[in-house]
Amino acid sequence: MNKILVTLLSVTILVFIAQACSKLEPKAPREEDLLDGPVEGLSHEQSRRFLAGDVAFNDEIFTEQTGLGSIFVATSCGTCHAGDGKGTPFTTLTRFGQTDSNGNQYLHLGGPQLQNRALPGYTPESIPAGATFSKFTPPANTGLGFIELVSDADILAMADPNDDDADGISGVPNYAHLPAFISPAANAIPRNGKYIHRFGKKAAAYNLMHQTVNAYNQDMGITSNYAPKDVYTGIDIDPEVSNSTVQNVVFYLQTLKAPIQRDAANTEVIRGKNIFTQIKCSSCHSPQLKTGYSPIAALNNKTFYPYTDLLLHDMGNGLDDGYTEGSAKTSEWRTPPLWGIGLSPNAQGGQYFLMHDGRAKSIEQAIEMHGGEAQQSKNNYMQLSSQDKEALIKFLKSL
């Protein structure tokens, strides 16, 4: 009898321990809860390049000995894009000096980007007196390869510069000159020697090569064969990062997976999606786009769901920082993709920092800050019942 009791007691203890361990043991996150990771369908060689770019982007921390500075913003790419997610007010960068008919009058004073940190013995930059400026929080990096492959024709098809349909929304592309190291896409549609740009808060970068080279040079003070000018001295110097490293980082950014919607079949999420359309949020945050041709099969002719039109929209006086880039006006901002917005707190310390400078601390606040072309959609949102607002936010958090 005692043996039976001992056996039962032992079994009970083992079951208790197993249950306790199951609660304490960390579980791997679901794939849809992660922002980083490669797009499905890469070949063995493409996976190798992705991993090489991953290491260069996230693990390589520059020092004075490896080319950092002399003035800079960050010491690595991953500093501002933790887990390939959005940045915070602690990782913002500052752009200054409004361009007018005579060009940017502050280029000789370090514009347009402020390098606010410096190596010992050097002086970091400060914003010149009288210069307009804007602070930008780093964006999430996921799905960028899909966005890069949207054709100019498709972007122009969403534009309505004269508001011909009288809906109050008149999105326009940002046209700007290309740097010497960038060749336009085969299907590019230029205007007066300028090309449609699509990356950045004001769509100031043409493609991911443009964005990456600028980040190395302006964020970290790292020269390359593509951008050999030292940001401190203004003199061309030997490259501090190799062509292959830059190209691997570009490939890494191109092949990061797109954010995966969660709980798409939830009835409240579906209802929120319908409300999103009804109050005309989708007029700018276009749900569906398609890539064109790509030598990367995983990106070639794919339909994807970023919730952006890649166009500039006038967002009103409340979001006018007095700073412009390319053909963008001071109050115009590129429609940010909404995919991944529900996962933003994972990279932002458990809370939201939305809008171009992180001023909105919730999705609700971000909506309420919309003005200009988005004023009517904001008004429609404000008139929703509390239940409908909750459904809309639930949908947005599922993206």
Question: Across the structure, where does each feature detected by a protein language model lie?
Answer:
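Periplasmic c-type cytochrome electron-transfer domains
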Residues: C21-L399
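Bacterial N-terminal signal peptides
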Residues: L8-F16
